Structures are given as C-alpha cells and as structure tokens.
Amino acid sequence: MTPLRFVFGIHQHQPVGNFDHVFEEHTRDVYLPLLKLLAEREFFPIVMHLSGPLLEWLHSNHSKYLDLVSDLVASGKIEMLLSGYYEPILAALPRRDRVQQIGWMHEAIESRFGVKASGLWLTERVWEPELAADLSEAGVRYVLVDDRHFLISGFQRDQLHVPWRTESDGKYVDVLAIDERLRYLIPFRPAAEIASYVRELRSAGHQLAVFADDGEKFGGWPGTREWVYDKGWLRDFLGTMEKLVASGEIVMSTCTDALGAVRSGGLAYLPTASYREMEAWSLPSAAATRLGKLETELGAGRIAGQDGAFIRGAHWRNFFVKYPESNRAHKKMLALSALSRQRGDPEEARRAIGRAQCNDASWHGVFGGLYLPHLREAIWLNLARAERELRHGESLAAEVVDFDADGNDEIWVHSSRFSAVVSPVQGGAIVEYTVFEDGVNYADVLTRRREAYHEVSAHPVAQEKSDGVPSIHTLEQSMTLTELPAFDPHDRALFVDRIVSIADNTTIRSWAHVALAFAVVGPGEIVCKGDGIEKHFRFADDGSIAVTWMWDPARFDDNAAFATEISLSRPLDIEADPTATRSTMQVETVAKSERGFERTVQGESITLGWSASLGRAALRIRPYSRHSATGMEGRRENGAPTPTRDELHAPLPPT
C-alpha cells in the first residue's frame, strides 16, 4: 500500500502594535522550543508561515531564530509560505493592494531565506472566489483553505485528500484542503489517537493529509505549554510519527512535493467562507444566539458530520456591519489607499497603509483584537502617518462623502494636521478625530455592546473529562459571567447630545439617532440642524474644534439640562463655560478572549451640561501641546495619571 503523504504546517503571527513582551514570551515559550524539538527529531520536511510583523520583530530581537529557519530552508527541510505581508484579510483589500501585500512577502522571503515561495497561507482562511485571479497574478501557485470550504460546496470528505484547482477571470491556482479533524486532534489529543486517524486515512486509500494551523497552539494557548512540553505530548507525537514513517505508512511532505506526486481531483469553485467559529462570531448577537440553539438542537454528532457544513454563520465582512469602529477604520484605509495611488503612492504612506491593513483589530471572537485598544491604536497610528504624508502642505478643506458606505453622507474635514468625520445621521456627532502629530484617533472608543456570549455565559457547557487537553473552542464554551455587563444605547463618539432630567439624570430627549440636515458654509464651518437643535462646528487648521449649540428653551422645563457626551480614547483639552457641569466615567467593556472574560478600559466619557433654560451652549476642544507641562503624556482629563496600555487591559477575576 502506498504511504500517505503527511503535510505538517505551522502558521506563526503577532499583530501590528502588539506588546513587545507578547512577542518575547511567544518566541521564548512557543516558537523556539517547537522548532528546536522538530530539528532535534528531524521531523521534516514541514511548511511554515511567519507573518510580516513577526518577521520584523524577530529580525530586530531574535535573529538567531531566523538563522535557524534559514538553515532549515536551505537544506530543504522547511517550505516557506506566503501571505499578505502585514497579515491582512486579502478579501477585504483593493485588488492592487492584495497583489502588493503578497509581493512584499515574496521579497521578504527571498531576501531573508534565499528562496522563491509559491504557496500561500490564507489569513483566517477567509476565501472569496475572485481571490484566485489575484493570487495567480501575485505568483501564488497554491493556497491552503479549510476542508469545510469544499464541504459547503457539496464535496464529500473522501474527495478532499487530493489537490484541486480553482479559477477566476481565466487565472488558476491549486487548492489544498486542511483536514479539520487533524486540526482538532493536534495537539489536544494523545499521539496514539492521531496515529489511529492517520492509519484510517491510509486504509481508505487516501494519498494526502494536510495539517496546518497556528503555531501558538503548541504552548501559547491556555494549558497547552504544560501539555505539549511538560507532560511530553510533543515528544510522544514526534516519536509516534517517526514510527509511522519508519514502517512506510506515511511520508513527510511539503505542499509542493504533494502537488507533484498526487494527481489533481479536478476543478473546484469554492464559496465565500472561513472556518466555522469565525462565521459564527461575525453574526449579530441575536442571530448568533439562534445559531447556537440550532446547533444544540441538531446535536454535536450531526454538526460534526457531513451535513454540518451547511449550518453556518455570516460572511467575514459582516464584522464591518456588526462593529462600526471596525468599519470606520476599514473605510478610512480604503480612502487613503485610493488617495495614495492618485498621488504617486509615496513609499512611506503605502507602507503605513499596509500596516493598517493588519486584520487583528478588525474582528472579535475568542480570538481577534477589536476589543484590544492597543491594537486599534496601532491601526489608527498608521492611518495617521499615511494621511499626514499624503496631506503635507494642504490647507483646511471639507468633503461631503458617504465615508462609511452606509448610504448616508458624512462630512470629512481635513488639513495637513488633522482629519475628522462628522456624521449628520448621528445627530452631528464626530465619529473620527485624528491628530496627525499625536498619531491618535481621539474618537476611537469602543461602544459597549451586548454580545451573544453575554447571554449564554450563565449556562456554560460542561467539559467532559478526557486524557487530552481542551481546545480553545472547548474552553470558550465553558466560560461564565456572574452578571451581565453594561451596554450603551448608542454608538460612542464626540458630541452626542441629549436633554436630561437634573433630578435623576434620565434622558428626556436624545439626538444620538436623529438625522440632521447639514450645510458646509466654509472650509472648516459646518451647520447641522433639525428636530429642535442647531449645532455649529468651526474647525481650525491646527485641529482645534469650536462647537456651539442652540435650542428653544421653551420646549423644556426648568429641571432639564442640555448635555453633550464626549468619549475619548486619550485626554484632550476641553474649554467650556465655568457654569457647565462636568462628569466623567471610564468606559469599560467585558469581552471573551482565549484567557477567559476580560475587563478592558476603552477610554473615558466626559459629559458637560448646561441648564436647558439657557438655549445655548459652547465649548472648544484641542489636543494638549506635546511641549506643554500639562501635555497629553502623563495626565487624564480629570487630572489622574494616564494608565499604561497594560493597565487598560486586565482579566476579570475567576467566577
């Protein structure tokens, strides 16, 4: 009987803007020990993907790791995989940007490892059919996707242990299916169980089995370091696989070797897809709850079976619908990418845009970094760098444009020093306020939303006892909350206006969801009005903003106050009439991560109020001078020290 070709692939990535200590800990605890043990046991050949942000950090901080990889590549023991260099979701990029991102990775691999790569690790396995043409144009011969992508199209599992070919616009790329069962077995189950499955595949006459998954599974996920290293799983696994090789049952293979040795299954057209959990995470909260109930009714056995692929969630791009914060960053990236192309694509701006295309801060699940302020900050920092380069020397201007692609116009105000977006359909709130010198979008405060897991966490799924270690998705189901967290009735922004009762602060009237008529009366002057309020913005070239409100005081009694809420990611200088009241609170979210539920400070809410009987209010905001003793560094609006990024993100105590 012919040996089964076994492909062992590891993908290793850290996002743009992640903490230095996270890079360091993963290199020390995961990347180095894994590679050293693979080399010690000669468990080769394998395939490997290193993302651009991780490559850059390793080059500066752990070049010996890259030297080891380079030696193994040179000896034919490692086949390197491409991706978009800064680990973008390729489907979410303009087509030219996709090809350029892959081109950067081509250059990096050839420069550092001396080889031309031809296979692609598809970030988060987010596939769209048109990608085939762009991958082919970028010099990609083959791409790895989940076997589920095929199952959704009606393929049988038994058909997936061979390469397939797909096409778009007359261009072709080969597709290899990653075996989902292997992903769930490795490294969570004993080596003997994995060997049994591999033998089962060979006995069925299959020629190829592909495992490719996160390298962080081998010591970076909760509980895995003890299991993989201290309890000896990795040594047991390598020893077991060595015996399978020695007995002629399997042969280790690269993807390229497999393409040459295993005949193609033919033509396959795959639908838009990602992995099962990702599609569930992208659903709105209510829909995700319904999907969970449906899966429970069908039972784990049926979901894991052939029909389970037809029970699925939403498109990855639905995160842009679910989270406006993600959408704004994405649409800002698209706008700047187009502007950069129009202006000759200066290298500094293009690289900053490329870094801002890193995927992690765009989505949220048990993985995903949308809830992590430092990852969103890194995206906005790079967008600020790009826009500063592109707008050098520009004077103040305002554009009326559907900035967020929601069918409603916004006003984009910008100069050589700042960029801001006013949303008339949100009562004239400012939804972006980026100061280029600071590299900060001060409006980047995540809204507190009800997530599906907030509802179900009071009824966790019990973990079955086993002789393995639970996967991250099993741990996800067992997390619990003792109480539901607070959530916001509207999206957070700058200048969200309402009338409140002075007695108990309850809202009498809110303009958060009111669409106001608007007019741009000058380069930096905007008027929004309607439904009993008139709101004037005056933007200065240096980025300061003066806001004036007018309303009919006769519409409200003497016990009412006009209030505007300003949600800030970092402190700003706020000048208001001394008679204005002022209250502050931290904006904290409670979200699920691979470590459990975590409480994260997203920013600060500052509410200023005036008696409604006045009929008028005004204030001015501006960034603190970096050269001032009361500057942005080291203080908050209420005078308290600015917390470090580590202090902003902390786990909840066990429940």
Question: Which ranges hold each PLM region?
Answer:
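Acidic, His- and aromatic-enriched active-site or binding-groove loops in soluble protein domains
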Residues: 65-82, 103, 115, 136-174, ...
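Acidic-aromatic substrate-binding/catalytic surfaces of carbohydrate-active enzymes
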Residues: 24-28, 96, 100-103, 416-522
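CE4/NodB-like, metal-dependent polysaccharide N-deacetylase domain
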Residues: 97-124, 199-211, 550
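Catalytic domains of cell-wall/extracellular-matrix polysaccharide-remodeling enzymes
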Residues: 103-158, 217-237
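Acidic (Asp/Glu-rich), glycine- and aromatic
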Residues: 425-427, 432-438, 447-449, 531, ...
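Active-site and substrate-binding clefts of carbohydrate-active enzymes
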Residues: 2-32, 39-41, 160-165, 171-173, ...
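Beta-strand-rich recognition/accessory modules
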Residues: 402-403, 510, 515-533, 541-548, ...
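Short, well-structured secondary-structure segments
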Residues: 3-94, 100-101, 118-122, 141-147, ...
